[in-house]
Amino acid sequence: MTASAKPVSSVDSFFSATLAEADPEIAAAIRGELGRQRHEIELIASENIVSRAVLEAQGSVMTNKYAEGYPGARYYGGCEWVDVAENLAIDRAKKLFGANFANVQPNSGSQMNQAVFLALLQPGDTFMGLDLAAGGHLTHGSPVNMSGKWFKAAHYTVRRDDHLIDMDAVAKQAEEVKPKLIIAGGSAYSRPWDFKRFREIADSVGAYLLVDMAHFAGLVAGGVHASPVPYAHITTTTTHKSLRGPRGGLMLWNDEQFTKKFNSAIFPGLQGGPLMHVIAAKAVAFAEALRPEFKAYAKNVVENAKALAESLRAQGFDIVSGGTDNHLMLVDLRPKGLKGNVSEKALVRAAITCNKNGIPFDPEKPFVTSGLRLGTPAATTRGFGVAEFQQVGSLIAEVLNAIAQGPDGSAPLVEAAVKEKVKALTDRFPIYQ
């Protein structure tokens, strides 16, 4: 070593070592996941593929900064740049959804909904939400969730004949149970929501209206789905799914009287320091969603969902409610003699990723189910169009028809052949090159 040479210290290594050098096991897992995303068709309705810019923001030095409080009113010094990021996220969210107020700090969809309960209800209060078995969500009153344990959930459901929400039945139930809060929104409902009627029902019984648009927020932002913001007292959404941002939550409202309640419910009510690297990534995603090309994306998501549903219907599969008006659909597998869990595994072996899902009035247990939930946001992001989704429908049918004829829920030769077709298709639409 020469006199001018500087030995490599642990500090130098800490700031310069790549992930592969510092933790090869995690690096290998990430490479494996990237390979999976590149070579599988992602049909999980709650998943998407973020831009490289979102990844860069979320992996930035913003992760180092504690920033309890809100912009201009922090409990820590040195927050001038994270204030810039959070203010940009707030302003962009308000512009994107036409809301007067926004809170971008919720770490997740569950926490944003918990914050609404904390702000507006007392333990033991009655609220209404769509039954999980009919397409609702855990945080809308499932007995295994905090919302169902600490509050009295009165669930509305869908009709047995067409699997649509009966708004007259919702109104009658609201009059009977007198809820303090009514939730519209869900995780597996493929038809439009009548936000105006929900607000009228809420007003008639003196209830607040919460719209959880976590699944279809990107469609609202893109102008292909009605917006709940003018009708709801509070609108919540995740920032991933169809909105195509980082995993996190967002709260929107118009009436200033709620501002202190909702902001205080997030901090200090539920959270401490916000995840500033995620908030920076949210700001990036909101800016992307404000661009004209996002409107085209949202339009394509819906068109592709309709194409996939029709492709499956044409090949003898039942679609719950007969089709879809948004980004997702439920496939009723009972006419094929199949279960959701078996079908999910077979499709995964064929490099088509989806999830088993209960259907309305499903006789099977949640880990079995009689259905599959399919969604189009992720594959649309990578460039799939109507023709590709028609092909995807044929590939799904090829696998499911094959396992329906087999004795053990598998069809190795067909699954392998479909996997090769999937690779040929995904190779035409590469990601993160």
Swiss-Prot record:
One of its GO terms (molecular function) is pyridoxal phosphate binding. It is an enzyme of class 2 (transferase). It comes from the Bacteria. Its cofactor is pyridoxal 5'-phosphate. It catalyses: (6R)-5,10-methylene-5,6,7,8-tetrahydrofolate + glycine + H2O = (6S)-5,6,7,8-tetrahydrofolate + L-serine. Its EC number is 2.1.2.1. The modification N6-(pyridoxal phosphate)lysine is found at residue 241. InterPro entries: PyrdxlP-dep_Trfase, PyrdxlP-dep_Trfase_major, PyrdxlP-dep_Trfase_small, Ser_HO-MeTrfase, Ser_HO-MeTrfase-like, Ser_HO-MeTrfase_PLP_BS, SHMT-like_dom. Keywords: Amino-acid biosynthesis, Cytoplasm, One-carbon metabolism, Pyridoxal phosphate, Transferase. The record marks 240 as: Plays an important role in substrate specificity. It is found in: Cytoplasm. Pathway: One-carbon metabolism; tetrahydrofolate interconversion; Amino-acid biosynthesis; glycine biosynthesis; glycine from L-serine: step 1/1. (6S)-5,6,7,8-tetrahydrofolate binds at residues 132, 136-138. The keyword Cytoplasm applies. Its main location: cytoplasm. One of its GO terms (cellular component) is cytosol. GO terms for biological process: glycine biosynthetic process from serine; tetrahydrofolate interconversion. Catalyzes the reversible interconversion of serine and glycine with tetrahydrofolate (THF) serving as the one-carbon carrier. This reaction serves as the major source of one-carbon groups required for the biosynthesis of purines, thymidylate, methionine, and other important biomolecules. Also exhibits THF-independent aldolase activity toward beta-hydroxyamino acids, producing glycine and aldehydes, via a retro-aldol mechanism. Belongs to the SHMT family. Homodimer. This is Serine hydroxymethyltransferase. The gene is glyA.
